[in-house]
């Protein structure tokens, strides 16, 4: 098992697959999702973009905590794993004190499930390497310090022989990944097993 943490643009990754932090309708969105769809269009033209959009439409829906796979149609990574994490409905970051509420812990479990689903899809498709961004930490608003703990712990426990690259475009997310688990993040989880 190899887990690396890097900063950069996920669309340039040359692993077997990259992960799209997707919405449940698998529609083109903002953040990482928008960057991936945009890169497919830039590199492969309108046809590749339409193929990706159609592949997502054909799948139709992916529930929170799960993941599905499509070809990338134009990127260096041949596949895109679309993982749906939870939309954070918990307290705002400045109001977030330990321990997390039962509803917030449910969202922790959903996020852990999304990371597990990515690794399951890799195994099902014989993929040996994957690049994963922060799932749910952008417009879905999941606290980055808690998300970093989940990402690292799930990948360390379950990646097996899959090479995992946890990637961040932003400095603050990169710091959270590199320093996780922090005492503050662990206190919020209060021993919760996901």
Question: Which ranges hold each PLM region?
Answer:
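Macrodomain-like recognition of ADP-ribose-binding/processing modules
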Residues: 1-194
């Amino acid at each position: 098992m190899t887990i690396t943490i890097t900063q950069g643009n996920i669309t340039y990754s040359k692993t077997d697959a990259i992960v799209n932090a997707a919405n449940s309708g698998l529609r083109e969105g903002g953040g990482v999702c928008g960057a991936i769809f945009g890169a497919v269009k830039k590199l492969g033209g309108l046809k590749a973009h339409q193929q990706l959009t159609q592949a997502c439409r054909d799948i139709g829906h992916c529930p929170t905590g799960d993941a599905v796979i499509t070809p990338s149609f134009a990127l260096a990574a041949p596949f895109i794993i679309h993982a749906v994490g939870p939309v954070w409905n918990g307290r705002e970051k400045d109001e977030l004190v330990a321990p997390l509420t039962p509803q917030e812990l449910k969202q922790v479990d959903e996020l852990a499930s999304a990371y597990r689903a990515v690794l399951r899809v890799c195994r099902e498709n014989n993929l040996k390497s994957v690049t994963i961004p922060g799932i749910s930490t952008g417009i879905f608003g999941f606290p980055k310090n808690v998300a970093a703990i989940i990402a690292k712990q799930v990948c360390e426990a379950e990646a097996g022989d899959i090479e995992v690259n946890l990637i961040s475009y932003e400095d603050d997310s990169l710091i959270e990944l590199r320093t996780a688990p922090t005492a503050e993040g662990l206190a919020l989880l209060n021993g919760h097993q996901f």
